[in-house]
Amino acid sequence: MAKVESFELDHTKVKAPYVRLITVETGNKGDKISNFDLRLVQPNENAIPTAGLHTIEHLLAGLLRDRMDGIIDCSPFGCRTGFHLIAWGEPTTTEVAKALKGALEEIANVTKWEDVPGTDIYSCGNYRDHSLFSAKEWAKKILDDGISDQPFERNVI
């Protein structure tokens, strides 16, 4: 079986919340795609409940695109500690951390239920499993902890 980078990462050494560059892949025509680890909570110490994580996912889909060009996808980790962010080009971890911070600030302080996209049977495959209350509480906690642009040392942006 192929080795997967995220399973090679020593999850006991990282210091969440952080943004980590996993890899930059170069396509046949020279296009670059960057893969980031947006770790919101400390692995094996906490996990965001699915309803809150699901709502954060739906909100980050738009809010990160409002703050950064070239976003391809932002998908949650199965362990519920964060997200993969895939983007064209080579944005820095600092740029991504600033965009993430701004998005979480909007979730925590501004977002209302009617702002959450994809919350009905037509636009979401599990539309009943959302919680804006949980999303706001987790966003506040992550912001209070501070988002670092480095995974192994705290360099809060």
From Swiss-Prot:
<feature type="binding site">
    <location>
        <position position="54"/>
    </location>
    <ligand>
        <name>Fe cation</name>
    </ligand>
</feature>
<dbReference type="GO" id="GO:0043768">
    <property type="term" value="F:S-ribosylhomocysteine lyase activity"/>
</dbReference>
<comment type="function">
    <text>Involved in the synthesis of autoinducer 2 (AI-2) which is secreted by bacteria and is used to communicate both the cell density and the metabolic potential of the environment. The regulation of gene expression in response to changes in cell density is called quorum sensing. Catalyzes the transformation of S-ribosylhomocysteine (RHC) to homocysteine (HC) and 4,5-dihydroxy-2,3-pentadione (DPD).</text>
</comment>
<keyword id="KW-0673">Quorum sensing</keyword>
<comment type="subunit">
    <text>Homodimer.</text>
</comment>
<feature type="binding site">
    <location>
        <position position="58"/>
    </location>
    <ligand>
        <name>Fe cation</name>
    </ligand>
</feature>
<dbReference type="Pfam" id="PF02664">
    <property type="entry name" value="LuxS"/>
</dbReference>
<protein>
    <recommendedName>
        <fullName>S-ribosylhomocysteine lyase</fullName>
        <ecNumber>4.4.1.21</ecNumber>
    </recommendedName>
</protein>
<comment type="similarity">
    <text>Belongs to the LuxS family.</text>
</comment>
<dbReference type="GO" id="GO:0009372">
    <property type="term" value="P:quorum sensing"/>
</dbReference>
<dbReference type="InterPro" id="IPR011249">
    <property type="entry name" value="Metalloenz_LuxS/M16"/>
</dbReference>
<keyword id="KW-0071">Autoinducer synthesis</keyword>
<dbReference type="GO" id="GO:0005506">
    <property type="term" value="F:iron ion binding"/>
</dbReference>
<feature type="binding site">
    <location>
        <position position="124"/>
    </location>
    <ligand>
        <name>Fe cation</name>
    </ligand>
</feature>
<keyword id="KW-0456">Lyase</keyword>
<keyword id="KW-0479">Metal-binding</keyword>
<dbReference type="InterPro" id="IPR003815">
    <property type="entry name" value="S-ribosylhomocysteinase"/>
</dbReference>
<dbReference type="InterPro" id="IPR037005">
    <property type="entry name" value="LuxS_sf"/>
</dbReference>
<keyword id="KW-0408">Iron</keyword>
